[in-house]
């Protein structure tokens, strides 16, 4: 029987994990077209206001969540160093990335971005996992897909939750 980790031991173990490296392994194995999907987001911003492409903005917020950073302000502070900027540049294929976007820039972008654009990325990811049969062990009686329904919402956010 495995020894249950204490909360302190769990925190210490998490310090040893390189979340960025782990994310890159997962992305490479399961989502080989992930960067292209981020680049293909149709945005509504006026071209004269664009400093950062959609893939940079979306990748930054994804890495915030992957890294376990809970606030946008902390993300801006933690990511504002040359190592992070160089890593983002390499992963996204940019040679001229000098700064990571400020959290206000990301928030403004996300406010204007149609939800359907994010749904396209989510659908791509779910389909990729299903194609690789990663979700097979979660079938009911090895035959049926289970669907979780959360009935706590007050409003419907989308007509097409998953196509």
Question: Which stretches of residues belong to each language-model region?
Answer:
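Short N-terminal helix-initiation segments at or just after the protein's N-terminus
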Residues: 1-8, 44-53, 93
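Active-site-proximal, Lys/Arg-enriched surface segment
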Residues: 107-163
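Alpha-helix boundary/capping detector
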Residues: 13-14, 101-102, 132-136
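Flexible, active-site-adjacent loop/turn segments at secondary-structure boundaries
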Residues: 36, 98, 152-154
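Short, positively charged, Gly/Tyr-enriched micro-motifs
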Residues: 50-124, 128
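Glycine-centered secondary-structure boundary/capping sites
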Residues: 33-43, 68, 89-96, 133
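Charged, often Cys/His-bearing segments associated with DNA-binding zinc-finger transcription factors
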Residues: 1-35
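Basic, short loop/linker segments at the boundary and entry of helix-turn-helix/winged-helix-like folds
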Residues: 24-59, 63, 107
């Amino acid at each position: 029987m495995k020894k249950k980790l204490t909360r302190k031991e769990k925190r210490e173990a998490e310090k040893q994990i390189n979340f960025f490296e782990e994310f890159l392994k997962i992305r490479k194995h399961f989502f080989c077209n992930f960067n292209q999907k981020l680049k293909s987001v149709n945005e509504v911003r006026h071209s004269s206001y664009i400093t950062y492409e959609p893939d940079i903005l979306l990748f930054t917020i994804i890495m915030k969540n992957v890294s376990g950073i809970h606030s946008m302000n902390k993300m801006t502070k933690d990511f504002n160093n040359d190592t992070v900027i160089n890593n983002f540049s390499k992963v996204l294929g940019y040679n001229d990335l000098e700064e990571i976007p400020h959290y206000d820039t990301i928030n403004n972008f996300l406010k204007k971005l149609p939800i359907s654009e994010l749904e396209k990325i989510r659908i791509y990811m779910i389909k990729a996992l299903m194609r690789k049969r990663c979700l097979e062990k979660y079938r009911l009686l090895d035959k049926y897909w289970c669907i979780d329904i959360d009935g706590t919402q007050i409003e419907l956010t989308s007509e097409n939750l998953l196509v």
